[in-house]
Amino acid sequence: FNPCPYSDDTVKMIILTEQNKKQDFYTLDTIGEHNQFNKLTAKSQVVFIVWQTGIGDAITARAASGLAMLVDKYQMAPVASDIKLCNAGCYCRPTAIQFAWEHKCVGIRCSDPGVPTDGLSGRPHYGETLHKVRSYNGK
């Protein structure tokens, strides 16, 4: 697990739970300080986590260590090698999100939801990726 050497303390996560397929936005700091992760996992299993960073931003070592702690504590699968973490400003594929759901992986990181495509290949953006997740879950 190699965190990017940049500074951004506003890392957000989307937590999808098997129980209600609900999407919740938190920061790693919020989860750590307010113990919200324990509350979320008390009644439903966390399946995977999506990090959202803005264009040109990246996770901090603090956020990375926090995520690693959550993965270890709740025995979630590590990031699958054939998914790989996206670099800041790139776009995650819906197939990667589906793979993560199936294998209960964490650590799929996507770019700014306000940008429709990467401008080059027209790959789907963050919002569309999440739409695929909702569709995949029968919603």
From Swiss-Prot:
Membrane-crossing residues? none
- Reaction(s) catalyzed by this protein? a 1,2-diacyl-sn-glycero-3-phosphocholine + H2O = a 1-acyl-sn-glycero-3-phosphocholine + a fatty acid + H(+)
Q: Name one GO cellular component term.
A: extracellular region
Enumerate the UniProt keywords alphabetically: Hydrolase, Lipid degradation, Lipid metabolism, Secreted, Toxin
Q: Which is a GO BP term held by this UniProt record? A: lipid catabolic process
Stated EC number for the protein is 3.1.1.4
Describe, from its UniProt entry, the tissues in which this protein is expressed: Expressed by the venom gland.
Question: Which terms in the Gene Ontology molecular function aspect does this entry carry?
Answer: phospholipase A2 activity; toxin activity
Location within or outside the cell? Secreted
Q: What does this gene product do?
A: Has a highly toxic phospholipase A2 activity.
The name under which this protein is listed is Orientotoxin-2
